[in-house]
Design a protein with these regions (language model features):
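Short Cys/His-rich zinc-binding micro-motifs
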Residues: 24, 409-425
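Radical SAM enzyme [4Fe-4S]-AdoMet core and its adjacent flexible, acidic
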Residues: 145-156, 163, 167-271, 275, ...
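Short cysteine clusters
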Residues: 27, 31-34, 270, 276, ...
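N-terminal [4Fe-4S]-dependent radical SAM core
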Residues: 1-20, 397-410
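Radical SAM/AdoMet-radical enzyme domain recognition
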Residues: 59-74, 83-209, 430
């Protein structure tokens, strides 16, 4: 027991990852949709700096808890560069000190990119850090919500940081939040990231801000939030571009997740796993929470300095948190044709009701269903390719042949004929649109 927390056998702990927040919620930007900035209120009068003894204890226990030959440290915020380079030099020293012979230690570092310069990039390159840089598209889309403390756009500052990263050949990916503004311009976003930035690895994260209101519309979302249907169309439009020309050269996280599911494997991303609880968050003072999206008092597992991290991760409280993702699904989800890949999505977004009136439906359900059903044929084809030891990129010539066949099929279809896609709708109300 740790302060009344029931634990299981620490030797049987499943693999887990912890998002470290050494500066807490402190950030040099004031992005309008950031859900984490308000977490500063949890720690009044705090210095918001992870002390050396907390860092060292975490590094040792986290490495000890890893059964495999590789361990990944995930740095987030707030903005982690505000800790300064020397802090991360110390972290690397601790990692070297406590890692086992033959163990590979890697660091994933999420940043807004504003403070990146020669010194940072030299450090990142020499220590093989993988950067995640936040960029929401070209300037008019990025600056819609990603602003500094004075309310000014940050696009130019981020682009300067990306230029440093590319010149030093630091490995990086782009994290793009999808909101009410850029969701209307999917190809503009994708082609900017692909062609202008030259990004090879891209993540799309939907912005969903639940409003605290009462009454029948208690699940309302902010004006900044992406509409569910728009999110589905955003993903599907980009997917159609990607599957026709970029498979094997551009890697989009949700497309990789989908292909894993279609191939009979686990999705590999907590949002789409059947259960969760393996991706936790640790604040600057050692407080460990069930999830980065549940940094709230009810989901505080305990403090690292009061016990062992494995005991906290293995607690019955955390296991129940993870199982609830599966066990609380409404019947509507249990019967859904895309449950195998969606699994109800992230619990933080399950605040609307099903058509039958049951609670617990994900706000993004309509978008997920639109996207996952829309990619079914080509995903089936790629899964078959992989099963037969062929590269997924072989889907691209197949797509081109399918397009030519489709053009031939619809060229003789009148607007009032039934659509050749088999929907049962008239062509003018279906694929002609």
């Amino acid at each position: 027991m740790i302060d009344g927390l029931e634990v299981t056998d620490s030797a049987t702990v499943d693999p887990f990852n912890v998002m470290l927040k050494p500066r807490g919620a402190i950030c040099n930007l004031d992005c309008k949709y950031c859900y984490y900035l308000r977490k500063e209120d949890l720690y009044p009068n705090s210095s918001f700096r992870m002390e050396k003894n907390v860092l060292e204890k975490f590094v040792k226990e986290y490495i000890d808890a890893q059964a495999g030959p590789e361990v990944v440290f995930s740095w987030q915020g707030g903005e982690p560069t505000l800790m300064g380079i020397d802090y991360f030099r110390q972290a690397v020293e601790f990692q070297t000190k406590y890692s086992r012979p033959g163990m590979r230690v890697t660091n994933a570092f999420q940043t807004n990119g504003v403070l990146i310069d020669d010194e940072w990039c030299s450090f990142f390159r020499d220590n093989e850090f993988l950067l995640g840089i936040s960029l929401d598209g070209p300037i008019e889309l990025h600056d819609a919500y990603r602003v500094d403390k004075g309310g000014d756009g940050t696009f130019d500052d981020v682009m300067r940081g990306i230029d440093y990263v590319q010149r030093y050949e630091v490995d990086y990916n782009i994290l793009t939040t999808v909101h009410s503004v850029n969701s209307k311009h999917p190809l503009t976003v994708y082609k900017f990231l692909r062609d202008t930035i030259g990004a090879k690895y891209i993540q799309f994260i939907p912005i969903v801000e639940k409003m605290n209101v009462c009454g029948p519309d208690q699940w309302s979302v902010s004006d900044r939030s992406v509409q569910s249907e728009d999110y589905g169309e955003f993903l599907l439009t980009i997917y159609d571009e990607w599957v026709a020309r970029d498979v094997g050269t551009i890697f989009v996280q949700i497309f990789d997740v989908a292909l894993a599911a279609w191939s009979g494997m686990r999705p590999g991303l907590c949002v789409f796993e059947e259960t969760c609880g393996s991706a936790l968050a640790m604040e600057h003072n050692g407080d460990l929470y069930s999830c980065d999206h549940f940094v709230e008092q009810d989901y505080l597992l305990g403090n690292l300095m009061d016990g062992n991290i494995v005991d906290l991760v293995s607690s019955s409280q955390q296991k129940q948190f993870g199982l609830a993702k599966r066990d609380d699904l409404p019947p509507y989800c249990l019967e859904c044709e895309v449950r195998f890949v969606c699994n109800g999505g992230c619990p933080k977004n399950r605040f609307i009701v099903t058509p039958a009136g049951d609670n617990g439906l994900n706000y993004l359900c309509a978008g997920y269903k639109r996207f996952f059903t829309g990619i079914n044929l080509s995903m089936d084809y790629m899964a078959s390719l992989l099963k037969n030891k062929r590269p997924a990129s072989d889907v691209m010539p197949w797509i081109q042949r399918e397009k030519l066949d489709w053009i031939r099929r619809v060229s003789s279809v009148n607007r009032n004929d039934y659509c050749p896609c088999g929907s049962g709708k008239k062509y003018k109300k279906c694929c002609m649109i």
